[in-house]
Amino acid sequence: MSAHRIRARRITRRNVPLAERCSFRIGGAAQFWAEPRSCTQLRALIEEAQRARIPLSLIGGGSNVLIADEGVPGLMLSLRRFRSLHTQTQRDGSVLVHAGAGLPVAALLAFCAHHALRGLETFAGLPGSVGGAAYMNARCYGRAIADCFHSARTLVLHPVRSRAKELPEVRKNAQDKRGECLGLDGGPFTCSSFQTVFARAGDWGYKRSPFQSPHGVELHAGRRLILSLCVRLTPGNPAQIRKHMQEKIADRISKGQFRFPSAGSAFKNNPAFGKPSGILIEEAGLRGTSCGAAQVAPWHGNLIINTGNATAHQVRTLLRVVRQRVFETHGVWLEREIIFSGESVRMTSSSRDS
């Protein structure tokens, strides 16, 4: 299958701007972009891209991602059309809510409010998609997705055994010396099975889920793609549920989370550090620090904002400055929460930037 045939598919477009699809409003274009409408289309796109030796990546709601200024090579998949939503009432009175990975978190919350289902109120105002929230094990006001997670339907990218002993760099051409298609971890893969993943306590942690990958949005062998999420909720008082949601949204607004484009929290909190990352950053005197149009928010240390036409390079530089200054001040290295995507980001990232 040639790259031309990939482009020719009606659901695939070329050179699609990504800045407008991400909350940071930063980044170049996707070389190829597709929004499959079904699991069949998704599977076909992945397999065709593999045969054509085209790198693959997957983006959720774009609320936690920094796209490289040069854009993203290969085919970027979006599951924004996976928006199914239905419920199952259980014998114990609880309700299982099944939501497609591409459904906006706001739409899921509106559904829960309308049907008086309690358990997700603290996520009111959270940007992004259901799949992205599950992938990150999103945590808001002390409650995480893991607290109500029941199961997720996934597509598994199984590794394909290769005869090659040594594999060349695949970030540029995604193929080995024989032209064999490779996953971005250096091995070929195929999407040969669907799998339902159920809750297991050991698989989850602070901002950690069993779906996460060190490759970020890039697809590779062993990756499980979230197609839909199932959460267990309980019936509640509709007025109280709406009130709780409105309070959380108002609190987010008062904290300036929506004043400028951003990717949310820049760094994860670490209980071992004794203080939230935002406080450590502020104590290092970094509020308002800028690199071009990228700035540490003057009102919140753990928020990097785009004050105008910031570039991904400026954001990455500012992230490095913040980490270095916090280390010099407190002796700890902050862990980045923002996910990097794109060729130059992958090639320039190091453990010190993680």
Curated annotation (Swiss-Prot):
It comes from Treponema pallidum (strain Nichols). This is UDP-N-acetylenolpyruvoylglucosamine reductase. The active site is at 265 (proton donor), 337. It is an enzyme of class 1 (oxidoreductase). Residues 158-184 are annotated as: Insert. Keywords: Cell cycle, Cell division, Cell shape, Cell wall biogenesis/degradation, Cytoplasm, FAD, Flavoprotein, NADP, Oxidoreductase, Peptidoglycan synthesis. GO terms for cellular component: cytosol. One of its GO terms (biological process) is cell division. Residues 26-236 form the FAD-binding PCMH-type domain. It holds the Pfam family FAD_binding_4. Its main location: cytoplasm. GO terms for molecular function: FAD binding; UDP-N-acetylmuramate dehydrogenase activity. Transmembrane segments: none annotated. Its cofactor is FAD. Belongs to the MurB family. Pathway: Cell wall biogenesis; peptidoglycan biosynthesis.
